[in-house]
């Protein structure tokens, strides 16, 4: 089965024709924190570009920061005094936290760093800079010249939606007052380069379209941008792709005003966190950022989450127990890719998903420390990172001979597992080793079984987890002790709970003398 990104890439080539270079675009308004839902737009453009590159084409991936949009409302996490900046470009609103040159830069810079950590190369462009240096001047003038046609297109869709037509004094652009920097209404155009405006403060004047103070309205700005950069593909959320929305009007405006065809698009669905209700909003502050995911996920897994889901399918990221399954799934796909494990089903699609979720694929399988087991080991106070690596090698989870890349990856996973246990793990997964044996009633046959296990461990200089597991089952079976009674007693003895991690692996990870003493109720 063909991966969805390859399917889209093939469709772009068919519909846009053979080119030496294709342009893919994504874009976001930095009105608040750029969250994992926003990232889906950039990643969808990126992965389709990746597929085009793999077919031998040059690709330019533009990510447009719409930082020349108005500051529309004061978010909850911003001081109410910021209402005085409403109507100004977000790129000119001061940073409330005082660490960046502007409100917009505060959010853009963080997201750009997060994207870089994923190894994704993208060309970030800033609408404020493009407008201010006059790069769009010719296209803005064309929009003024085609005002009547644009109104006709927009009114056609407004009528279908049973909305009133645009007023006769509507213009396809707005002005930022050079004096107050607030949005001003246009009241006249001289037919050339000058526009007359009136700002909310009552100030009137003329500005030159080439001065950078005139900005196209969204439904005109978007198709103008497609034409200016010759965009071949840009994904969009379903609000932009609904019937009569900005994509529909944009398709007609780009053709009527700029004489070009609209790029191909693809609708992407919502991204949320399992268990959280409602839609994330960067301006409301109820968001999960890429940097939040980096606290518990390797970069490859973040990319994998988005690569394996078709864009029209909703993603619910499970940061609870489902995260352990995600690591298991990713590790399995990675092993299949490197031929270490056989696969059932469509092997090629699995391999392609792995390829597309990695900008730079290693030349061999880097050691995979099982995250599920790491979540146990990081809770053992006697084990530091080196101790954990020793347990992993002794129990055969990773090779005994480790290279630098292997050790780096294992150490990263150890840190991620610690973070997961602290922040997201349910109580059923958490435990602590009891410093002293608890005072619990233990049946005589269970005591005998405990002593037999203690003697067996004492007699061995080394042993495998499987050997210990067999002993644990045998000593209970020959005494007629039920598995439930036997295992719950041992868990209570070590962690004070009736359930816990896989017992043999757990006991084998503890200090041998400590296990023997505890089984004898000595300490």
UniProtKB/Swiss-Prot annotation:
Cite a single GO BP annotation: lysyl-tRNA aminoacylation
Q: What is its EC number?
A: 6.1.1.6
Source species, domain of life: Archaea
Offer a single GO CC term for the protein.
cytoplasm
**From the record, which residues define motif 'HIGH' region?**
30-38
User: Which keywords does the record carry?
Assistant: Aminoacyl-tRNA synthetase, ATP-binding, Cytoplasm, Ligase, Metal-binding, Nucleotide-binding, Protein biosynthesis, Zinc
Keyword Kinase among UniProt keywords: no
Compartment(s) of residence: Cytoplasm
Name of the top EC class for this enzyme:
ligase
State the Gene3D superfamilies in the record.
1.10.10.350, 1.10.10.770, HUPs, Lysine tRNA ligase, stem contact fold domain
Where Zn(2+) 2 is bound, by residue?
Answer: 177, 180, 199, 203
Q: Which GO terms describe its molecular function?
A: ATP binding; lysine-tRNA ligase activity; metal ion binding; tRNA binding
Q: Which residues bind Zn(2+) 1?
A: 95, 99-100, 106
Per its Swiss-Prot or TrEMBL entry, what cofactor is needed? Answer: Zn(2+)
How is the cofactor bound, as the UniProt entry phrases it?
Answer: Binds 2 Zn(2+) ions per subunit.
Q: Name one Pfam family in it.
A: Anticodon_2
Q: Where is this motif: 'KMSKS' region?
A: 279-283
The protein's annotated catalytic reaction(s) are: tRNA(Lys) + L-lysine + ATP = L-lysyl-tRNA(Lys) + AMP + diphosphate
Q: Which family does it belong to?
A: Belongs to the class-I aminoacyl-tRNA synthetase family.
In terms of PANTHER family, this protein maps to: LYSINE--TRNA LIGASE
Q: What is this protein called?
A: Lysine--tRNA ligase
Q: What species is this protein from?
A: Pyrococcus abyssi (strain GE5 / Orsay)
